[in-house]
Structure formats: C-alpha cells, structure tokens
Amino acid sequence: MSDSISVIREKLNQVTSEHDPFFQKCMQDERKGVEKLLQTTRRKWEKEAQLRNKLEEMKQYETDLFQQGYKYIAGVDEVGRGPLAGPVVAAAVILPDDFSVVGINDSKQLSEAKRDALYETIQTEAIAVGVGIIEHNVIDQVNIYEATKLAMRAALDQLQPEPDFVLIDAMPLKYTEAELSLIKGDTKSISIAAASIIAKVTRDRLMQMYDEKYPGYDFANNMGYGTKKHLHGLDTIGICPIHRISFAPVKEAKLHFDSLK
C-alpha cells in the first residue's frame, strides 16, 4: 500500500467494520504504524459497542413502560444532599422513545466537559425538563431528606406534558401511583441519568456563581462539600449566607464566631 500513515488514519476513521475492503487491505500492510492504527481502530469500535450496549441496557425500563402504553415517562434525580452550603437541586426529564444519545450515565461518572455537552443535548432533545431548587434555609427548616422531596416535586410540577409514569432515583416520592423507585437508578435508567446530568450541571453553575459572591470557601471546586479548603474557610472566615446551619461543621463554626462577639 502506497498511502502514508496519516492518509490511512483518515480513511480508517470512515471504516466501521473489519470486513471493509480497505481494512482488509491495511491488514496486509506490514508497517508498524499501520498495525498500531488497526489496533486503535479496533479499540474504538469496542468502546463504541460498549456504549451502545450500555445505552440499550439503560433504556430497558423505559422500553418496557412504553410497551405497556405509557407515553410520558419522567426520570427524577437530585444532587446536593451532602454539601454544607448551597441548595439541593432536583431535575425531572421526559425523553422521547427514540432517544439514542450514547454516553449518558450517572453524572458523577462523567467529566465536566461531557456533562456540559450532554446537558445541552438533553435540553434540546427532551420532551420536557423541569428543575427544582430548594435553598439552604428551607433545608435547615425541614431537614435535607424532606427538602430533597420538595425539590423533586417542584421539578415534576414544571413538566409539560405531565408525566404518566415516574422513575425516581433511590427514594420513594409518592408523587403519583404510577412510579418506581430504583436504587442507583442513575446507572440503570436513561431518564434518571439524564435528570442527574441536568441537576448536577445546574447546581455546579450555581455554586460557581456563589464562589464569586462568597470567596474563601472554594465553592467553585468543592460545590459546597466539606473539603479541606472549605473547612479552612469556615475556621478562618466563619459562615456565609448560603451555609446550612443545621449541618454540624457549619453549626460549630457559627457557635465559635458567635462566642467571639
């Protein structure tokens, strides 16, 4: 074969099977560079196949429900139960039955760049998206568990059309009789995973904004979780207006600074 390595690389990017005549021709090329390109191409195909298989696995709950006659299946998830500061955010997403975007998974397993890209895709292709945000002061009043349910209900209330079935990550919500709670649902249901991405990106952007408003806690990086830098900020600056007073480290910091007044 007279093609250069760079030309072969470009051509292999268009090939989708080992049975392709060009791939077969490359297999006869004894150059080490071509051999490496073939190995890279095979690995790419394997990864793409894994992603397609994962997509089909994660659509199984939705597929079964569509076959039962349900039309608007909402997935619900939340982010922000554990942080010491900021709101808890929930999202609800209704996807069309032909949604086939690979790579959607539990938002915590995705890079920030991948989450941001999928966020835009979901917002564009979803039938409906709802977001519920429950602030720190309500969390302190009702506790984080109840606040999470409030956020989920608020997200579901925004959906138009209304869902006729609800898939929820982990916690029973009793929003409707037609609902199912799935442990680790964001790794099992495409709708819940999509909701986890919407919730995560929404909350992360809020915390990045709060980092500019309340510097000294590293909110842009820790998203309000109790990291070393965040705890150092509590020890040296005290609390800020978005801290959750009912959470132990925040309560202790408040008591300490109140005692100095």
UniProtKB/Swiss-Prot annotation:
Catalytic class of the enzyme: hydrolase
Highest taxon in the source lineage: Bacteria
EC number: 3.1.26.4
The keyword Chaperone belongs to this UniProt entry's keyword annotation: no
Cofactor note: Manganese or magnesium. Binds 1 divalent metal ion per monomer in the absence of substrate. May bind a second metal ion after substrate binding.
Catalytic activity: Endonucleolytic cleavage to 5'-phosphomonoester
Classification via InterPro entries: RNase_HII (IPR022898), RNase_HII/HIII (IPR001352), RNase_HII/HIII_dom (IPR024567), RNaseH-like_sf (IPR012337), RNaseH_sf (IPR036397)
CDD domains, alphabetized: RNase_HII_bacteria_HII_like
UniProt keyword annotations, A-Z: Cytoplasm, Endonuclease, Hydrolase, Manganese, Metal-binding, Nuclease
Binding site for a divalent metal cation: 77-78, 169
Cofactor: Mn(2+); Mg(2+)
Main location (coarse class): cytoplasm
Ranges of residues in domain RNase H type-2: 71-259
Location in the cell: Cytoplasm
Gene Ontology CC: cytoplasm; ribonuclease H2 complex
Any Gene Ontology biological process: mismatch repair
A molecular-function term among this protein's GO annotations: manganese ion binding
PROSITE patterns linked to this entry: RNASE_H_2
Task of the protein: Endonuclease that specifically degrades the RNA of RNA-DNA hybrids.
Protein family per UniProt: Belongs to the RNase HII family.
PANTHER family in the cross-refs: RIBONUCLEASE H2 SUBUNIT A (PTHR10954), RIBONUCLEASE HII (PTHR10954:SF18)
Protein name listed in UniProt: Ribonuclease HII
